[in-house]
Amino acid sequence: MKKKKALPSLLYLVFIVLLPWGVSSSFNKCLELWIKNWWNTRQSETLLTDIQEKRILERFIELEELSLLDEMIKGKLKTHVQKPPTGIHKEIIQWVKINNEDHLHTILHFSTNIICLAILSGSFFLGKEELVILNSWVQEFFYNLNDSIKAFFILLVTDFFVGFHSTRGWELVIRWVYNDFGWAPNELIFTIFVCSFPVILDTCLKFWVFFCLNRLSPSLVVIYHSISEA
């Protein structure tokens, strides 16, 4: 009976692993044209917000100051400047286009990831039976190992996720998530996450080892502490 259920469960596991990549690839192309049309229509029908106007004005002043400084260095600045150089107008237009493209890609990535998470959640909900079978396989495989191998795997997992060098890995993970959703990097959030999340995870793992694993296999806990303290 277990062998008959083996193939569907393995196929379900492969489906879950490949699902995010497939959804991202297919929906990116489908949503890109629709979001572009919506964004262009929205931009043409609405005025600039106060934040956008402020950013454009700051950019204009910055470019004007740089242009005047460049003319001063070249010795071409006149006593009275009647109007800003024509190049500033083109640069402002180009900057606005780039800014709009950034907003568009942010909306596109965010929408694609929300759809992917929704489909993935639905797949987990509909595939409860396969998840139960996979969970039973993992537990059976783990319990059939001797205590030394179990302790080795537990140490490997804990050191990988909460070890000395794990902070760099978690930083890469949070940066990848921000980049995948199209969000602007925030160093403060990165620092808080890297400093707090591994500590919370380490506490949960120690709680599991002390309370849960100690009831299942006291000898395994003894081996685990002996290896970790060596």
Swiss-Prot record:
GO molecular function list: antiporter activity; proton transmembrane transporter activity
One CC-aspect GO term: chloroplast inner membrane
Protein known as: Potassium/proton antiporter CemA
UniProt xrefs under PANTHER family: CHLOROPLAST ENVELOPE MEMBRANE PROTEIN (PTHR33650:SF2), CHLOROPLAST ENVELOPE MEMBRANE PROTEIN-RELATED (PTHR33650)
Superkingdom of the source species: Eukaryota
Main location: plastid
The keyword Transport appears for this protein: yes
Family as reported in the entry's similarity comment: Belongs to the CemA family.
Protein role: Contributes to K(+)/H(+) antiport activity by supporting proton efflux to control proton extrusion and homeostasis in chloroplasts in a light-dependent manner to modulate photosynthesis. Prevents excessive induction of non-photochemical quenching (NPQ) under continuous-light conditions. Indirectly promotes efficient inorganic carbon uptake into chloroplasts.
Region forming the signal peptide: none
One record GO biological process: potassium ion transport
Reactions mediated catalytically: K(+)(in) + H(+)(out) = K(+)(out) + H(+)(in)
Pfam families assigned to the protein according to its UniProt record, in alphabetical order: CemA
Keyword Metal-binding: no
Transmembrane region(s): 7-27, 107-127, 145-165, 181-201
Keywords: Antiport, Chloroplast, Hydrogen ion transport, Ion transport, Membrane, Plastid, Plastid inner membrane, Potassium, Potassium transport, Transmembrane, Transmembrane helix, Transport
Topological type in the membrane: Multi-pass membrane protein
InterPro entries: CemA
Subcellular location: Plastid, Chloroplast inner membrane
